A protein has these predicted regions:
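Preference for protein termini
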Residues: 1-433
Length: 433
C-alpha cells in the first residue's frame, strides 16, 4: 500500500479472484473507496424493469429473425452472420447471460441506455466484490444470494448441454467437456471467464469443465478438439461474435464461418448463442423504440414500459427528421464509449458538442461500424465519491444482470464523464433503509 492509499475494503478483495484491481498504469486503483446507497425499492425497480425489457427485447428479436435479410443488413449486421441467426438453441432465448445498463436522469429515474447481450463482463464486481464491500462496511448487500443464483443458472446450463450421456453400445459415459474460453492475456476477460467456470464446477462437481485459451483453440471436421482427444460439447466464449465472424485462418479461410458451420451442425453448444448479436447491435434499441411507437406490435403495457425506461433511440436514417436538441451518436458496434459523440441539432444542421476520448483505445477491440444510431441526451445528476487520489465528482452507470429471463445482481460504475468509458471506477452498491 503506498502513501496515497488508505486501508479500505479493497484490501479485503481476493486478488486471485479480482485480478484487475490495479489496471495498467492508471493512477488510481479500479474500485472506489466509498459505496453508494439506494433503497431496496430502487433495486426492485431496476430488476423489474430489466425483466420487462428482456421479454420485450426477445419479442423484438423474433421480428428481426423473421424479417428479410436486407433489413438485417441495413442494421449493419454482418452478412456472414445471417445464416446462423435462426438456429434454435437449448433454451430458446437469444441470449442466456446479459446485462442491462441504465443511467439516472435529473429526476433520479433510471433510463436504460444499453444492453450487453453477447459478452457481458462486470461479473466479478457485481457477484463477488460488491458483497465484500457491503460486509466490510456492515451494510446490506443488494446482491445477497446472487452468487448462488448464478451458480444454479450455470448448473442448469451444464445439465442441458454437457451432462454425460451413456453410450449403451460401449457401456461407458463418454466425456462431454464444457469449455470456457477467452484470450488469456487480458486480465478482466480471464478473471470473468474463470469466475463463471469455477461456479459451474461448484454446481456440477462431476462434470468435465475446463479452460482453454482462444490462442490455443482449434477446430476440425468434428468440432473443437481438446488435448485429451475429446471434443468440446459446449463452449463459453468471451469473444465478440461480430469479431469472430470475420476471423480467418493463416491460409485465408473463413474461420468464423467454419466455426459457426460446426455449431449449426450440432457439434457443440454456444454460450451465448450467435443470435445474441441481434440484441448487441445498438440499432436494435431503435427497432424496439420504433415498434413501441407504432403501438401495433407490443401490448399497451409493453409500450408503456418502453416509453418509461428505454431512452428514445433512433435509426441513423431518421436523424434528419428529429427535432432540435442534444443527441448521443453511437456507432453500431462501439464498445467502452469508443467514438461516442454528443451532437447539437438545430434546424437542418448539427454540430459535435463533445466527443468521447477513451484511455487505451487501441486495447478496445470492436468491429468497425458502417452505421450509427442516436439516442436522446440524458442530463445526469453528479455524485461525489472517494478514490485513491482523493474525492471526485462523477455520474453513475447502473447495471442489472439477467440469467435467462430472471434479473439477478446489480452493479455500478462511477465516471467523471457523463459518457462512461475505460476510465470508469467500480462503485459498490449497498441497501439503505
Amino acid at each position: 500500500m503506498n502513501r496515497t492509499q488508505t486501508e479500505s475494503y479493497i484490501d479485503a478483495l481476493n486478488p486471485r479472484v479480482f485480478t484487475y484491481i490495479q489496471y495498467a498504469d492508471y493512477t488510481d486503483r479500479y474500485p472506489t473507496h466509498t459505496v453508494h446507497e439506494f433503497p431496496q425499492a430502487f433495486y426492485d425497480e431496476m430488476r423489474t424493469a430489466s425483466a420487462g425489457l428482456f421479454r420485450i427485447f426477445c419479442k423484438a428479436a423474433e421480428v428481426l429473425q423473421n424479417a428479410p435479410d436486407d433489413f438485417a443488413r441495413a442494421m449493419d449486421l454482418p452478412r456472414e452472420m445471417l445464416p446462423y441467426l435462426r438456429i434454435p438453441n437449448a433454451f430458446r432465448l437469444p441470449t442466456w447471460l446479459s446485462r442491462f445498463d441504465f443511467v439516472l436522469d435529473e429526476e433520479g429515474r433510471i433510463r436504460m441506455v444499453e444492453i450487453n447481450a453477447d459478452t457481458p463482463c462486470f461479473i466479478v464486481e457485481s457477484f463477488y466484490a460488491n458483497g465484500v464491500a457491503a460486509e466490510y462496511f456492515g451494510r446490506r448487500d443488494p446482491n445477497a444470494g446472487a452468487r448462488a443464483q448464478l451458480r444454479d443458472f450455470l448448473t442448469q446450463i451444464h445439465a442441458r448441454v454437457a451432462a454425460p450421456v451413456a453410450d449403451l453400445t460401449q457401456g461407458t459415459l463418454p466425456p462431454r467437456p464444457f469449455v470456457f474460453s477467452c484470450f488469456d492475456d487480458y486480465p478482466e476477460d480471464l478473471a470473468n471467464t474463470r469466475f463463471l467456470m469455477q461456479l459451474m464446477q461448484e454446481g456440477a462437481p462431476h462434470g468435465d469443465i475446463r479452460f482453454r485459451s482462444f490462442y490455443e483453440m482449434e477446430i476440425d471436421a468434428r468440432g473443437i478438439p481438446l488435448t485429451d482427444n475429446s471434443y468440446a460439447s459446449a463452449l463459453y466464449r468471451l469473444h465478440p461474435m461480430e469479431i469472430l465472424i470475420d476471423e480467418r485462418t493463416a491460409d485465408g479461410e473463413p474461420l468464423g464461418a467454419m466455426f459457426l458451420d460446426l455449431y449449426q451442425e450440432g457439434c457443440f453448444a454456444l454460450m451465448n448463442p450467435p443470435e445474441a448479436i441481434l440484441l448487441q447491435n445498438k440499432s436494435f434499441m431503435a427497432l424496439v423504440h420504433a415498434l413501441a411507437a407504432s403501438e401495433q406490435f407490443f401490448t399497451p403495457d409493453e409500450c408503456a414500459l418502453v416509453r418509461r425506461y428505454l431512452v428514445p433511440s433512433y435509426f441513423e436514417d431518421d436523424f434528419d427528421a428529429l427535432g432540435d436538441g442534444r443527441y448521443i451518436r453511437k456507432e453500431i458496434w462501439g464498445r467502452e464509449g469508443r467514438n461516442v459523440r454528443v451532437v447539437q441539432k438545430h434546424c437542418n444542421e448539427h454540430t459535435t458538442a463533445f466527443e468521447k476520448e477513451i484511455d487505451y483505445a487501441d486495447e478496445v477491440i470492436c468491429r468497425e461500424s458502417r452505421a450509427a444510431m442516436y439516442q436522446d441526451f440524458i442530463a445526469q445528476p453528479r455524485f461525489v465519491h472517494t478514490v485513491d487520489s482523493g474525492t471526485i465528482e462523477g455520474c453513475l452507470t447502473l447495471s442489472c444482470f439477467m440469467l435467462f429471463g430472471t434479473p439477478s445482481a446489480v452493479g455500478a460504475r462511477f465516471s467523471p464523464a457523463e459518457i462512461a468509458g475505460t476510465e470508469a471506477y467500480f462503485l459498490p452498491l449497498v441497501t439503505g433503509s
